[in-house]
Amino acid sequence: MRNSNTPIAAEGYPFIAGAVLIAVVLAVLGSKIPAFFFLAVFFGALTLFIVFFFRNPERTTPADENAVIAPADGVVIYLGPSREEHLGEEMTKISIFMSVFNVHVNRVPITGKVLDTFYIKGKFLDVRDDRATFENEQAGLIIETAKGMKMIVVQVAGLIARRIVCYAAKGDQLVRGKRYGLIRFGSRLDVYLPSETAVRVRMGDKTVAGETILGLLP
C-alpha cells in the first residue's frame, strides 16, 4: 500500500504546480499591465493555501496496541450506537468532521488486515446532515485485527469535498498510524468499533490523526 512520507501529500502537487504556473505568467504580464500583477498576488496566495491544505505532517502514534486511533484531524460530531449494514452488527460509531483548515491526510486506526472494501456512489450533502451517512458518496475498509476484532472506517464525501482517495485494497496488511488516503477540501470520517470498546472521546472533542485515542479494544 502506498504511504507517502513527503511533507506535502502527492495529490497536492498538480494543484500547486498549476497555481504557481499561473502566478508566474500573470507576474510577467503584470510588469506591463498592472492589473495582472494583482491577479499574480492572488494566485501566489492561493498557492500558499494549497500547500497548507495538502500538508502531510509526521505524527507520533501511541504504543498501546489495543488503542484505536483517530483516522482524521477534526472534531467528534457523533458518538453512539449504530447498526453497521456491512457486518450486520450493532457497533459504536464515531464521526469526525474535517474542516478545510484541518490536515486531510487519513491514517489507519488499528493494525490489521483489510477483509474487504466498499465504495458507494452517492450525493454530496453537507456531512453534518444525518442523511449523509446513507446518501453520500463514500469508501470504506473492513479491518480485522490479529485477535479477530472487526471494525470499519469510512471516508464520506461532502458538499465541498468531492474526491475520496484511498490507497488500501482488499488483503492489505495495515499498520496503525500509517497514511492510507485523504479527502480533498473537508469532509467526514466514520469509525465503527466493536460495541465492547472502551470509548475515550466525547462529543465535541478535537482529534489528531494518528495520535488521539478513540477507544481501547478489549
Curated annotation (Swiss-Prot):
Supply the source organism's classification.
Bacteria, Pseudomonadati, Thermodesulfobacteriota, Desulfuromonadia, Geobacterales
Q: Which UniProt keywords apply?
A: Cell membrane, Decarboxylase, Lipid biosynthesis, Lipid metabolism, Lyase, Membrane, Phospholipid biosynthesis, Phospholipid metabolism, Pyruvate, Zymogen
Recorded E.C. number(s)?
4.1.1.65
Asked if the keyword Membrane belongs to this entry, the reply reads yes
Protein name listed in UniProt: Phosphatidylserine decarboxylase proenzyme
The gene name reads psd
Q: Which domain of life is it from?
A: Bacteria
Q: Which catalytic residues are annotated?
A: 187 (schiff-base intermediate with substrate)
Q: Where in the cell is it found?
A: Cell membrane
**Which GO molecular function entries does the Swiss-Prot or TrEMBL record give?**
phosphatidylserine decarboxylase activity
* Site positions (Cleavage (non-hydrolytic)): 186-187
What is its membrane topology?
Peripheral membrane protein
* Source species: Geobacter metallireducens (strain ATCC 53774 / DSM 7210 / GS-15)
